[in-house]
């Protein structure tokens, strides 16, 4: 009985750690598109204090290659997000985003850890060639590894419950 409880706990911890690793990895170093998008953010002044908030986003807004790389930087889900409206709205003075602070944030931060857009404000999604404003598609599918880990966790839970009976 104690063995089953320890085994269940160990498997749950490993599964949670793997999910955290996968979600972090999905936008940084996942594929060459992610690396290129990150490099282009750096080139626009992500780490440069002399680059203003609007200049930074203006640089990204006009960079079609950056936007293309960002759209292709998606390894674990099938979400297709067009972030150009968000980036360009941050580049204008009269945007709804305003000046909350003087620091810049990575465009990669538009997504939360679960790969869904962090906010519907200014976010557009693209489906079948049409652009639908302010819709959050969320995560459509996940990788085989994530499905395996989820199934494994559920199976482990059932083994634990059966062990209690």
Curated annotation (Swiss-Prot):
Disulphide bonds in the chain: none
GPI-anchor amidated serine lipid attachment residues: 143
One GO cellular component, as annotated: side of membrane
Description of what induces expression: Up-regulated upon milbemycin A3 oxim derivative (A3Ox) treatment. Expression is also regulated by CWT1.
Membrane-protein topology: Lipid-anchor; GPI-anchor
Keywords: Cell wall, Glycoprotein, GPI-anchor, Lipoprotein, Membrane, Secreted, Signal, Virulence
Description of post-translational modifications: The GPI-anchor is attached to the protein in the endoplasmic reticulum and serves to target the protein to the cell surface. There, the glucosamine-inositol phospholipid moiety is cleaved off and the GPI-modified mannoprotein is covalently attached via its lipidless GPI glycan remnant to the 1,6-beta-glucan of the outer cell wall layer.
Domain of life, source organism: Eukaryota
Propeptide: 144-165
UniProt subcellular location: Secreted, Cell wall; Membrane
Signal sequence annotation: 1-16
Family label: Belongs to the IHD1 family.
Function as written in the Swiss-Prot or TrEMBL entry: Probable GPI-anchored cell wall protein that may be involved in cell wall organization, hyphal growth, as well as in virulence.
Protein name per its UniProtKB record: Probable cell wall protein PGA15
């Amino acid at each position: 009985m104690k063995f089953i409880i320890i085994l269940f706990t160990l498997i749950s911890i490993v599964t949670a750690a793997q999910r955290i690793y996968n979600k972090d990895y999905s936008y940084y170093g996942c594929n060459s598109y992610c690396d290129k998008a990150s490099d282009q953010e750096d080139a626009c002044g992500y780490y440069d204090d002399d680059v203003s908030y609007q200049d930074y986003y203006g640089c990204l807004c006009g960079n079609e290659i950056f936007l293309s790389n960002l759209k292709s930087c998606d390894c674990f889900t099938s979400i297709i997000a067009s972030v150009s409206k968000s980036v360009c709205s941050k580049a204008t003075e009269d945007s709804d985003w305003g000046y909350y602070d003087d620091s810049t944030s990575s465009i990669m931060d538009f997504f939360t850890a679960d790969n869904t857009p962090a906010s519907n404000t200014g976010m557009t999604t693209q489906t079948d060639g049409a652009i639908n404003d302010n819709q959050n598609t969320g995560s459509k599918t996940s990788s085989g590894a994530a499905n395996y880990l989820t199934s494994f966790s559920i199976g482990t839970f059932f083994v634990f419950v059966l062990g209690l009976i």
